[in-house]
């Protein structure tokens, strides 16, 4: 999804939240997120085992719209730091998803190539970001989809078993007409992503 700063910009433009409250809201949101993580996130043997197995064959990176402190809390709580070769948070990039920057930087830092990089994404913006970066995309619906079997089968172009049907805008026969030239500046600034809404 969108980072907090982007969501606040949209609310500011719609005059639903005064701009002067942005800093206070972001601070409070970060405090609550850290509190929830510290209280509820615990070591998960399945997640640990997954990272352990994958790290024996592949380089693992984490790219997130979360802030660095939140990312590090999660890595520490799950005890997966030794399996992660690279991690990047929203504070380390200029352009948030759906811009491909976060994945392009991850690919370069892992000394990989887009075609050799698999991205697991559960958000629409994240999926656009991954595809724009040229990476292979494995869309997921929930944590249940993130299994060693699904990941390795996807890499080998075999059938994977997902917990639910994945919604996708991808369709070779779908044609989208966007009025005016380009993507529509007001549409982009409002925080929308492809496809452009016909009615607001």
Please report, for each region that a protein language model flagged, where it lies by residue.
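A metal-dependent, Asp-based hydrolase signature
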Residues: 2-35
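Structural beta-sheet core signal
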Residues: 62, 119, 139, 176-178
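N-terminal glycine-rich phosphate-binding loop and ensuing alpha1 helix
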Residues: 169-200
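Conserved SAM-binding loop
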Residues: 60-63, 95, 119-120, 199-200
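A general structural motif
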Residues: 57, 114-116, 171-173
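Short, acidic loop-to-helix structural element flanking the phosphoryl-transfer center
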Residues: 35-62, 68, 72, 145
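Asp-based, Mg2+/Mn2+-dependent phosphohydrolase catalytic module
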Residues: 48, 68, 72-168
């Amino acid at each position: 999804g969108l980072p907090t700063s982007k969501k606040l910009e949209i609310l500011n433009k719609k005059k639903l939240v005064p701009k002067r409250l942005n800093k206070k809201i972001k601070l409070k949101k970060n405090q609550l997120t850290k509190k929830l993580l510290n209280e509820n996130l615990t070591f998960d043997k399945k997640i640990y085992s997954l990272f352990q197995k994958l790290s024996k064959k592949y380089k693992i990176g984490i790219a997130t719209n979360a802030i660095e402190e939140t990312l590090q809390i999660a890595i520490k709580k799950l005890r997966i730091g030794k399996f992660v070769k690279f991690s990047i948070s929203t504070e380390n990039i200029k352009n948030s998803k759906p811009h491909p920057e976060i994945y392009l930087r991850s690919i370069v830092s892992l000394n990989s190539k887009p075609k050799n990089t698999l991205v697991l994404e559960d958000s629409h913006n994240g999926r656009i970001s991954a595809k724009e970066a040229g990476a292979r995309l494995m869309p997921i619906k929930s944590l249940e989809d993130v299994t060693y079997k699904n990941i390795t089968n996807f890499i080998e172009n075999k059938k994977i078993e997902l917990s639910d049907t994945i919604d996708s805008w991808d369709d070779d026969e779908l044609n989208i007409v966007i009025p005016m030239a380009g993507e529509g500046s007001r549409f982009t600034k409002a925080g929308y992503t492809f496809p452009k809404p016909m009615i607001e």
